[in-house]
Amino acid sequence: SIWEASGRWEAYHSSGQMFYCDMPNGSFCMAPTAEEAVFEFVRDNLKSYKDLPVNVYQIGNKFRNELRARGGLLRSKEFTMMDAYSFHASEEDLEHGYSIMKKAYLEIFDTLGLKVIPVSALNGDMGGKISEEFMFLSESGEDTILVNENETMAFNTEILEMDNYSDYLKQYYGIDDISTFTERHCIELGHIFQLGQKYSTTMKGTFKSNTNEDIPFFMGCYGIGVSRTLAAICEQNCTNEGLIWPDNISPYQLTIIYTHQKREIAFELYDCLQSKGIKVIIDDRYSLRLGSKIKDWKLLGIPYMVVIGDKCSGEAFELETRRDGSKKLLAKNDLINYLGKSSSAYIGT
């Protein structure tokens, strides 16, 4: 019913993108997006301008019957997404909240080591008048954008289909001249929207102003494709030998690999590093040779590796940095100090 109220049920239903089922007590869908559900929650709980602005977010799975599913995490029928929704008392406050979220998203991608370009785009079925995509330049991407020489401004080629695209670009995004812009392929990692009063008008959601008037909410919508962002990180950090996770998001800092004869030394080092808060994993598979273990862990992408061979006495350990392939021999305390400095780069530490 809330999808029918917003006017989007028929659009999603007829496009075939929505997973749904008809039951005796009504039709149900697996959420492809959450604007309607969030709006209903806010409409029933926020009544006054004093309650605004509000920004709510969630991280969870979305379901879309993608007609062009491809590339594993790049475009799948079930994916993880971080989506946020802001509610404001005026268009000016919406614009302010939008700019804060845009800055936050750019900082998130920068922390992840991904260079993204904010790209002017059409709002499409979402509604509203302004939206920007966060694009990661990649030849494997299926989106095409036009980018300026400095890679600081860009817009989606779909805008060129508008009759007044030059006026639109100038008015809303400050782009005057596109003669030097060139086509690039990219992957869309995030999208933010100024939805205005589209949903509050169709779904009848209002708040009391300071003059006691009923005013429809001004709404913003923001999303990051978590699954797709992981795919972009993998693409950017892949070598012929395998993946190399960036230090700050790798599930472990270090892999310990050892020969059967050096099991005791390996586990002493493992216990010591764990006690110091180092994120370490040890390969205790008995059936594999040392070379096979090394090959496996290079595929999995842990950024540092200690290989304990038959000649290791336990006084010093060879540390390999996967990023540049360099190796150094370090005493146990020096190894702990080195990895401790590396761990400070981890998100959340």
What are the residue ranges of the model-derived segments?
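NTP/phosphate- and nucleic-acid-binding module
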Residues: 1-349
